[in-house]
Amino acid sequence: MATLRVLLSCVRGPLRPPVRCPAWRPFASGANFEYIIAEKRGKNNTVGLIQLNRPKALNALCDGLIDELNQALKIFEEDPAVGAIVLTGGDKAFAAGADIKEMQNLSFQDCYSSKFLKHWDHLTQIKKPVIAAVNGYAFGGGCELAMMCDIIYAGEKAQFAQPEILIGTIPGAGGTQRLTRTVGKSLAMEMVLTGDRISAQDAKQAGLVSKICPVETLVEEAIQCAEKIASNSKIIAAMAKESVNAAFEMTLAEGSKLEKKLFYSTFATNDRKEGMTAFVEKRKANFKDQ
């Protein structure tokens, strides 16, 4: 949640502007974003791509950036052509934490009455699968933001940390909860109590990351995964996502009961019938998201 001066000091040389691939298709939403870039990608524009774009601040998560992120997520969630979303940052940083300047002078009353950081939770309410493509620093709020996503791909030089204790606070956007559920108590406790960072390789070994990619191909590989997801039925993908996420909230018995209920629910969809019929007929399924 914190952007630390000591972390910023480790970056040498001028920051490069975000690299924009010529193949990226413009995001025709009418939205005018200052802190993010939002575009549709994939052969059939089935992937929503959101790039955090505050390079001089290492993508520090100010209120304006989070508001724009939520706007873009809402637009992609409501776009029937989009089946999955990729969230990324820059080569130096996915996001180096929350914007400390916005938090420095807040009181308890300010935080409590305004439900500070509450609007960060919008990402967890998105029904479409979201992939975090993490290059560079994912510290504090940046690590928490990545953990809100459904899948994390990491560049080979990515680093993850919850260093809030070094500035006299604790994670406030799910860091102590999601990290513990993902990597276990011992590693989570060590990271939260020391502020130490872990590498992409350590994160993968701990189960925080599902794939490590070269820095230069990370986003494209995440998009390829998103395209594969988007080729399936959106309504069935949403059910699958709901069932997997329930494993973090329920007992095994409760989760299995929900899974069974969602499994039965697929039999009320045309896509379930089409998928099984296509399998029997040895052809590719033509899902209609119905």
From Swiss-Prot:
Its predominant location is mitochondrion
Q: Which UniProt keywords apply?
A: Acetylation, Fatty acid metabolism, Isomerase, Lipid metabolism, Lyase, Mitochondrion, Phosphoprotein, Transit peptide
Task: Note the Pfam families from the entry.
Answer: ECH_1 (PF00378)
Q: Where is this site: Important for catalytic activity?
A: 164
Indicate where the modification N6-acetyllysine is found in the sequence.
Answer: 101, 115, 118, 211
Q: Which residues carry this modification: N6-succinyllysine?
A: 101, 115, 204
Return the transit peptide range from the UniProt record: 1-27
Residues bearing Phosphothreonine?
Answer: 46
| Gene Ontology biological-process annotations | fatty acid beta-oxidation
Q: Does the keyword Transcription regulation apply?
A: no
GO molecular function list: 3-hydroxypropionyl-CoA dehydratase activity; crotonyl-CoA hydratase activity; delta(3)-delta(2)-enoyl-CoA isomerase activity; enoyl-CoA hydratase activity
As for subcellular location, the record says: Mitochondrion matrix
Task: Describe which pathway this protein belongs to, using the record's wording.
Answer: Lipid metabolism; fatty acid beta-oxidation
Q: Which residues cross the membrane?
A: none
Q: Which residues carry this modification: Phosphoserine?
A: 114
Name the catalysed reactions. Answer: a (3S)-3-hydroxyacyl-CoA = a (2E)-enoyl-CoA + H2O; a (3E)-enoyl-CoA = a 4-saturated (2E)-enoyl-CoA; (3E)-hexenoyl-CoA = (2E)-hexenoyl-CoA; (3S)-3-hydroxybutanoyl-CoA = (2E)-butenoyl-CoA + H2O
Q: Which terms in the GO cellular component ontology are assigned?
A: mitochondrial matrix
Gene3D superfamilies tied to this protein:
2-enoyl-CoA Hydratase, Chain A, domain 1, Lyase 2-enoyl-coa Hydratase, Chain A, domain 2
What Enzyme Commission number(s) apply to this enzyme?
4.2.1.17, 5.3.3.8
Please tell me where substrate binds in this chain.
Answer: 98-101, 141
Among PANTHER family, the record links this protein to: ENOYL-COA HYDRATASE, MITOCHONDRIAL, ENOYL-COA HYDRATASE-RELATED
Quaternary state and interactors: Homohexamer; dimer of trimers.
Q: Could you say which protein family the record assigns here?
A: Belongs to the enoyl-CoA hydratase/isomerase family.
Q: What does this protein do?
A: Converts unsaturated trans-2-enoyl-CoA species ((2E)-enoyl-CoA) to the corresponding (3S)-3-hydroxyacyl-CoA species through addition of a water molecule to the double bond. Catalyzes the hydration of medium- and short-chained fatty enoyl-CoA thioesters from 4 carbons long (C4) up to C16. Has high substrate specificity for crotonyl-CoA ((2E)-butenoyl-CoA) and moderate specificity for acryloyl-CoA, 3-methylcrotonyl-CoA (3-methyl-(2E)-butenoyl-CoA) and methacrylyl-CoA ((2E)-2-methylpropenoyl-CoA). Can bind tiglyl-CoA (2-methylcrotonoyl-CoA), but hydrates only a small amount of this substrate.
This one is known as: Enoyl-CoA hydratase, mitochondrial
From which source organism is this entry? Pongo abelii
Give me the gene this protein comes from. ECHS1
